């Protein structure tokens, strides 16, 4: 949007996590990072209301290394512009119900592309591509190894069905975020990582991406959406 002259900023709901010691619990006693209550809901509502009314807000920053909100905030000034709110619960009406309807455009972003071999059989599921994205992002930016991400993955998929697909019919637009080349990127990264507690799942994932030629991440354009998962070239 910026390249088209539209003033824009991204507001990630991940920055609104309540933090270590305050997360709701799953039935097995583990922290539940996926439910909407894992976010500071009143603070999300306040920031969105401020943006809708004035175009300006001071939003939190979450430190994934300490698993706590950072002491500093981020000043977002998008007066006469667009704020892209991204996150698992961005469609949840509990966050946006107090906003003017004409202030919100819901875009459902998901992977739609499938990959098949010469015999027509599916080589890899879209959820495997999403898992590879998340493993790479968590490893590079959130201080988590592959074991942590794979162990959490069944709960993530359950949360997707419960919290995203439930509100999919609220979408004004559907955006396919697939990149035909990205399977080669994940082959490049997944081949570097190991998992001990989830070695079998990691081996299965690696075997699926082994069908594709690795692509060096340096070849990905700096403005590509894939940089969300792999970072800038110099990171």
Can you annotate each of these PLM segments?
Residues 88-91:
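Short beta->alpha connector loops
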Residues 2, 74-78:
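A short acidic-Thr-Gly-centered motif at the start of a beta-strand
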Residues 93-235:
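Conserved NTP phosphate-binding and transfer environment spanning the P-loop NTPase/kinase superfamily
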Residues 9-11, 18-68, 82:
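Conserved nucleotide-sensing/catalytic segment adjacent to the nucleotide-binding pocket
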Residues 77-79, 101-102:
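Short loop/turn elements that form and flank the Walker-type P-loop nucleotide-binding site
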Residues 82-86, 107-108:
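Structural recognition of the conserved hydrophobic beta-strand(s) that form the central parallel beta-sheet
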Residues 63-71, 155-158:
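Short gly/ser/thr-rich secondary-structure transition/capping motifs
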Residues 1-10:
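Post-Walker A helix-loop "phosphate-sensing" segment adjacent to the P-loop in P-loop NTPases
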């Amino acid at each position: 949007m910026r390249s088209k002259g539209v003033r824009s900023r991204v507001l990630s709901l991940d920055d609104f996590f309540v933090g270590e010691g305050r997360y709701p619990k799953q039935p097995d006693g583990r922290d539940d990072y996926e439910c909407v209550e894992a976010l500071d809901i009143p603070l999300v509502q306040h920031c969105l209301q401020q943006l809708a009314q004035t175009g300006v807000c001071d939003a939190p920053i979450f430190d994934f290394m300490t698993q706590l909100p950072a002491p500093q905030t981020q000043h977002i000034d998008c007066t006469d512009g667009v704020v892209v709110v991204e996150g698992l619960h961005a469609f949840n009406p509990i966050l946006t119900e107090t906003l003017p309807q004409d202030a919100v455009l819901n875009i459902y972003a998901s992977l739609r592309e499938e990959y098949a071999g010469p015999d027509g059989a599916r080589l890899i599921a879209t959820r495997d591509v999403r898992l590879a994205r998340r493993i790479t992002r968590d490893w590079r930016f959130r201080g988590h190894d592959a074991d942590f991400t794979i162990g959490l993955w069944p709960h993530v998929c359950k949360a997707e069905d419960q919290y995203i697909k439930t509100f999919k019919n609220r979408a004004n637009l559907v955006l396919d975020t697939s990149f035909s080349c990205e399977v080669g990127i994940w082959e490049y990264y997944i081949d570097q990582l190991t998992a001990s507690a989830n070695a079998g799942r990691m081996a299965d994932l690696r075997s699926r991406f082994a069908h594709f030629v690795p692509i060096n991440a340096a070849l990905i354009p700096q403005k590509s959406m894939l940089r969300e998962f792999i970072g800038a070239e110099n990171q």
